[in-house]
Amino acid sequence: MKSNTSQYIPYNCISANLLENYEYPESPFFRGTGFFVYFPPFDDYIFYVSAKHCFCGYKENNFLEKLKIPYQYKTEENFNNSLDEAVIFSEYLTMKHNEEDDDFEDLIVFVVDKNIKKEKKLLLKTRALRLEHQDNIDKILKNLCNIEGNIRTVGFPQVSKEIDFDTKQARIQPRGFYGKIAIKENDINRYKFKQPSWKEGEYNGFSGSPILEIISFYNSNYEIVMEAIPIGILLSATKH
């Protein structure tokens, strides 16, 4: 990602969605991206967020056991180990824009089991992005739209993922891009990239990636700190 803010991109928050194959359990496959978040002051809860359409074809009660996300951020993994040592999720959440809507949002939130070992929870906490309150996110988005500011994303497109079934090795590389934000007309809470920097073909695999804004603030030592804040999720993209 060519940008002077690339040093602040939190690569370790993301994971490629590794899914167990119904018909061939020993041949898992990748579909989309997801990322870990937490929401102060409820620090006991850690969530994994992705696009719901990444799980099409799976019965809803099988989501939890078929998704295999490693506790540690890795770009190379023996997927036999990943299937055995995967994050345990206790439930998942789906949502609507309001109760009167017939359709659910293309969004799914997995809840990390609170009973996992302390060291594993701490490991996930270091990977998780801090969620802001919605009022703050709305202000950030409004300001970005007014100034046509840049937004960023990072994920695992298909061009950066490889599975070798002979050696049972999975290799993935995170990729990112940025572009100017614009409101998507006639859609509630939908935005789009203008002039995206992605030049490597299709966007397949980016679904579920976090949309990021880099903000600065003063810490307790009155030092300026830069932090990547999730302000949305990438649901779809088309090469023009």
Specify the residue positions occupied by each region the protein language model found.
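Beta-rich catalytic cores
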Residues: 30, 106, 207
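Short, solvent-exposed loop/turn segments that connect beta-strands within catalytic domains
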Residues: 23-28, 40-45, 103, 216-228
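Catalytic histidine site
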Residues: 4-91, 113-116, 180-182, 192, ...
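Catalytic nucleophile loop of clan PA
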Residues: 197-233
